[in-house]
Regions:
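Alpha-helical interaction elements
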Residues: 286
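Structured aminoacyl-transfer and RNA-binding surfaces used for tRNA recognition/handling
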Residues: 2-279, 289-306, 310, 314-348
């Protein structure tokens, strides 16, 4: 049972082994940390020989959720404006319940939500590390719940769904710490999962600290990470396709891809607010990185984002806004630079 002061009384989700059967082996220490592995964990993993197209993977996920009676919710708007300027997680759909103690949520069910996060891990020179992007599709299931037992049911279904896309239980590790955390008005307990050595998401039981009856489950992964786990293809090739071999830095590709999502959702560059975040992201694109434009990359990115989020602007308008912002900084120097050896523009 959740109490009004949950951090002082940790919730023991291991008391029923997270609802897992006897084929799972649990190890835990005195600090509450635990790892759960399948008893057949030593079997080799063979990556999918034929990677699914993005639409195919999304369709498989949606079908798996639908089979359990979980319907797909429409995406949240990219402009958030509450605690963050942009939507950074699908869990923001339950903000009214968890943060305000209100008896409603914005969305529930299966939610493939495009998100933007500026917190991706970077190396010593500031470049994004493999496995991280500024924007990605947060594959989520968001559910208000009334009993903690619903948590284990949602988790069990997720394991079944992962198996359906080729990520079988014997290659998964479930781990976490059996202790409650608190961040401002929200408390939670998090269980992580990884496929072999690759983290692929988590499931969190969440509740309002002042009113624990306001409770929800947030199951989250990333579409790109799931595809990476399935195929074990090189990360940048998976994320950017043919553009990864065009001689352009991954951070530049990432910035244009993210800007396409934001501009396509009606956010324009500005001095502050959501537009300020967009301007900051595009500052990573040097004027000489794309002297002939970014239209081909924008078109491909626009098609990707359109799979999960209807775009307010067509791709040619998005490309125009992005190019105008890139060249706003230094039009003279941009037009005087020589052409690069390769380009990712429609106009080459």
């Amino acid at each position: 049972m959740l109490t009004a002061n949950p951090p002082s009384r940790p919730l023991d989700l291991l008391s029923d082994r997270l609802g897992l059967g006897t084929q799972w082996e649990i190890e835990h220490d005195a600090n509450g940390r635990f790892e759960i592995r399948h008893r057949d964990q030593g079997t080799p993993y063979r990556p999918a020989s034929r990677p699914l197209q993005w639409a195919g993977l999304l369709n498989q996920l949606e079908s798996g959720f639908r089979a359990a009676g979980v319907t797909r919710a429409r995406p949240l708007p990219m402009r958030w404006g509450r605690d963050t300027e942009l939507t950074i997680s699908a869990v923001q759909a339950v903000d009214p319940l968890l943060k305000d103690g209100k008896p409603y949520v914005f969305r529930r069910g299966y939610l493939p939500q495009p998100v933007v996060r500026l917190t991706g891990e970077r190396d010593h020179v500031g470049a994004l590390r493999e496995g991280f992007l500024t924007s990605f599709v947060n594959v989520s299931r968001i559910e208000p719940v009334t009993r903690t037992a619903e948590f284990t049911g949602i988790f069990d279904h997720w394991l079944t769904l992962l198996s359906g896309i080729g990520l079988h239980a014997r290659h998964l590790t479930i781990h976490g710490r059996n202790a409650v955390w608190q961040r401002r008005e929200v408390c939670g307990l998090t269980v992580h999962f990884r496929h072999l050595d690759l983290p692929i998401g988590d499931i969190v039981l969440l509740w309002n600290a002042a009113d624990p009856s306001c409770m929800a489950v947030d199951l989250g992964s990333g579409l790109e990470r799931l595809a990476w786990a399935r195929t074990r293809r090189p990360w940048w090739e998976l994320a950017f396709g043919r553009f990864a071999t065009a001689g352009v830095a991954a951070d530049v590709l990432d910035a244009v891809r993210t800007a396409t999502l934001l501009v396509g959702n009606g956010i324009a560059p500005a001095a502050r607010g959501a537009g300020g975040v967009l301007r900051r992201i595009l500052s990573a694109v040097p004027v000489d990185a794309a002297p002939l434009g970014v239209s081909t990359l924008v078109r491909a990115s626009h098609g990707f984002w359109s799979l999960t989020s209807p775009m307010a602007l067509p791709w040619p308008e998005v490309a125009f806004v992005i190019e105008r912002e890139i060249h706003r900084r230094d039009v003279t120097s941009a037009t005087s630079l020589p052409l690069p050896r390769s380009s990712w523009s429609d106009r080459t």
